[in-house]
Regions:
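Bulky hydrophobic segments
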Residues: 1-92, 96-122
Length: 122
């Protein structure tokens, strides 16, 4: 398997694991008066970071990766009530927005900053 493929898969698995741990860990209720929508930025950033490596290193795999990432975000929302957290369509939509941003940035980075490939020795 080429290095780019290993990096794309490895980083995606690592980031997805971090997202799962952070979103499925029970947390105390936010203090009264806090803005309930403030966590949306975390969803956007997390799923943008999740999409970036695949978009940058293996853009052809996005046709499979993006639906898998969306299903992953949906599964997290389904499971959250079992760990004392709230299920939210808004969170899943924030995941979708983050994926879009991560894909756009990853594709742009891949176009303008190509992955450094070691030269073959002759």
């Amino acid at each position: 398997m080429p290095l780019q493929s290993k990096l794309a898969l490895g980083l995606s698995c690592l980031i997805a694991t971090a997202i799962a741990v952070l979103t499925l860990t029970p947390v105390p209720a936010p203090p009264l008066g806090s803005v309930a929508e403030s966590d949306k930025i975390y969803h956007v950033v997390a799923f943008g970071v999740l999409a970036f490596p695949m978009a940058y290193l293996r853009p052809r795999w996005l046709m499979l990766a993006v639906p898998a990432y969306l299903a992953f975000g949906g599964l997290i929302e389904i499971l959250q009530p079992f760990v004392g957290r709230d299920r939210s369509l808004g969170d899943w939509l924030a995941d979708l927005i983050g994926l879009g941003i991560g894909v756009v940035i990853g594709l742009a980075a891949g176009r303008f900053v190509p992955f450094a490939r070691p030269r073959m020795r002759r």
